Amino acid sequence: TTTDVHPPLYYVIMHVWQSIFDNSVASLRGFSVTCGVLTIALLFLLLQKLFSKRIAVFGSFLAALGPFLIRYSDEARMYALAALLAVAMTYTFIVAVEHKNKKFWWALYGILVTLGLYTQYFLALILPAHFVYIWLKLGGNRTAIKNIFKDKNVWLAAGTCFLLFLPWLPVMISQTSRVSGGFWIPEVTKFTIPATLSMFLTYDDRIVRYFGLLLPPIIVVISFILAKKHPKYQAAIWILTIWLLLPMIIVYTLSQGRPVYLDRYFTYSAPAFYGLIAVFIG
């Protein structure tokens, strides 16, 4: 895929998948469907670990019915795989934080992050959500930041990811330069992010007509209120909120210079959206 703008993992998997099954449309879409089902199962485990079984049942139910995940779980592209890896990365990270002396989980986390980067570069944008989670768990202060950077397990995960992704780094840089030379993606507007959130909910951006620019702030305000009301769950609430919104905000900002924002690029944020809705309602 060096002549494409996407990383290679999905294409490698598809090559193997076709050799085992066939190259029919149903077969190719079957892989994405499998990823979608596994995403819902892993989201259940993640929400159960972060909150409760009730929230997990509700959140995974919403995800199973979520039109955005359904749409891209039926398409022969890498977005369903990206969503699966985003949930897998986050779940493994939570377990690694809980078992901080278990190097296996930190190494596995580093491997999953690498697989995520080999699937969709923008998956790196959920890593700040992981950082905020461990920062809050360690006290949410300057000492916590120092402790994070002193943690050998954190460096184990980072080193694993760096070494495994290093061979592809020159290709990624080359792909980035080609995109900067001009591409077909439309320009962003002030309604771009609200429209994406609306698509998560109904796969129709018309809800923006009712909520407009207020949709992202509403999510942040509710998250803030719930985090203050339930300190036990503040890290869990913020990891979902940042996972949902920060990638969109970063890519939106980058798109002021040259457009790189498309709704489907954030399929991996959809599980966080459905999880948050479950938390807000539950």
Describe these PLM feature segments.
Residues 1-282:
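Membrane-proximal helix-loop-helix interfaces that form the catalytic/acceptor-binding platform
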